[in-house]
Amino acid sequence: MAESPIVNHPEQGLCRDCLSLQKTQTSRRCHACGSPRLIRHKELYRLSLAHVDCDAFYASVEKRDNPDLRDKPLIVGGGKRGVVSTACYLARIHGVRSAMPMFKALEACPDAVVIKPNMEKYARVGREVRQMMRDLTPLVEPISIDEAFLDLSGTERLHKAPPAVVLARFSKRVENEIGITASIGLSYCKYLAKVASDLEKPRGFSVIGEAEALDFLRDKPVGMIWGVGKAFAAKLESDGIRTIGQLQTMEEGALMKAYGTMGQRLYRLSRGQDSRKVEPDHDMKSVSAETTFNTDLSAAGDLVPVLRALSEKVSRRLKAGEIAGRTIVLKLKTQDFKLRTRNRQLGDPTQLADRIFRTGLQLLEKEMDGTRFRLLGIGVSDLSPSDRADPPDLVDIQATKRAVAESAIDRLRNKFGLNAVETGYTFSKGNLARTQTPTDRDNEP
């Protein structure tokens, strides 16, 4: 549990604009500046675990850099054959969503402006936001380029303010100095901090306290459980489980018998129990990506393109973080929810999609015995700085050529978008590799 034990503040509110503490509980506006942007919660000054998520990050950066786009629906993504990377909130009103095929997005919002992603620029802005987070606490755990968990417990004396006030200051600083907005979720555990940050986007600041957790979760759909994608939610619904409240009435043993290790997660998170600590990025143990399929798959022609797409996703994160890993880990879940993990250690650390994929493929081929799989994942562990990664292969000249080609592809994708270049593995099965992903989790412990 992440709470601030130092000061018992009598005030129950905070103004997000002037940052004054609110002593009255009935006023709808700040007593100091008149702003309606007030936060009130009984545990506001005790909680210290936060999830920070920049709002429509890619689109917000583009609108910041081009004021002419401010009042226009904006989609960041590939061409007509590509997919949406992100969309501004004006476009979302029309039904545009991330990962939507571009032609469908333009059907939903024909007046949208489409911009190809500039990953170098987004990474640069992401690093600026990350540094501001580290100014608050050393306990920053990045989840992606634009979001992270922060543990501010024990920082009240340093900042001379409780974590809620420090986070509100941070939000204003990001808006004023970087020119984009962020939403904040404050709670006592990672799971509910993440849930809270999604409640009032954009420019949100939501709080979920420990005392209210069970009641808050009771009527929520099972899809709100971290790690429950569309396919698994459909499975639970077919078993008669639609709400988190139903999970709260079930025994842990029964859930584990029905759903394996995922049953334990369902039991604990449905009760707001999440003991995971915030782990700083320099202690990150692995980088991974996984997908749960709409339909259980067994054929190589279906599995291999997805493995390639996931390998490229892991590779992008390694390169963005300037890290590499020495152990490749393959993760499979069978149709009866049994988990298989296989790993292989490399001679040198890697961040190349080609090496990750080819090693993962060797592991996957040994498991393709007709078994149908509902989940496929690939990851890299034993992480280290990338300065010693992927030395030239003096034996396998083709591997060196593939590494050079991958570097060229990276430059093209950074300039023109992720779908500017596709490999032979993903091109013919592109729709499967890109859209068969109702559950897509990264770095799950």
From Swiss-Prot:
Enzyme Commission numbers on file = 2.7.7.7
Q: Which residue spans adopt a coiled-coil conformation according to this UniProt entry?
A: none
- List of residues binding Mg(2+): 53, 146
Q: Which GO terms describe its molecular function?
A: damaged DNA binding; DNA-directed DNA polymerase activity; magnesium ion binding
**Biological process (GO), any one:** DNA-templated DNA replication
Q: Which Pfam families match?
A: IMS, IMS_C, IMS_HHH_1
Q: Which reaction does it catalyse?
A: DNA(n) + a 2'-deoxyribonucleoside 5'-triphosphate = DNA(n+1) + diphosphate
Q: Which InterPro entries match?
A: DNA/RNA_pol_sf, DNA_pol_Y-fam_lit_finger_sf, DNA_pol_Y-fam_little_finger, DNA_polymerase-Y, DNApol_IV, IMS_HHH_1, Rev_trsase/Diguanyl_cyclase, UmuC
**Subcellular location field:** Cytoplasm
Q: Which domain of life is it from?
A: Bacteria
This protein's major location comes to cytoplasm
Q: Where is this site: Substrate discrimination?
A: 58
Q: Which GO terms describe its cellular component?
A: cytosol
Q: Which cofactor does it need?
A: Mg(2+)
Occurrences of domain UmuC (ranges):
49-229
**Which residues act catalytically here?**
147
Which UniProt keywords are listed? Cytoplasm, DNA damage, DNA repair, DNA replication, DNA-binding, DNA-directed DNA polymerase, Magnesium, Metal-binding, Mutator protein, Nucleotidyltransferase, Transferase
Q: How is the cofactor bound?
A: Binds 2 magnesium ions per subunit.
Q: Which family does it belong to?
A: Belongs to the DNA polymerase type-Y family.
The task this protein performs is described as: Poorly processive, error-prone DNA polymerase involved in untargeted mutagenesis. Copies undamaged DNA at stalled replication forks, which arise in vivo from mismatched or misaligned primer ends. These misaligned primers can be extended by PolIV. Exhibits no 3'-5' exonuclease (proofreading) activity. May be involved in translesional synthesis, in conjunction with the beta clamp from PolIII.
NCBIfam families named in the record: PRK02406.1 (NF002677), PRK02794.1 (NF002751)
Q: How does it assemble?
A: Monomer.
What is the protein name given in its UniProt record?
A: DNA polymerase IV
Its gene? dinB
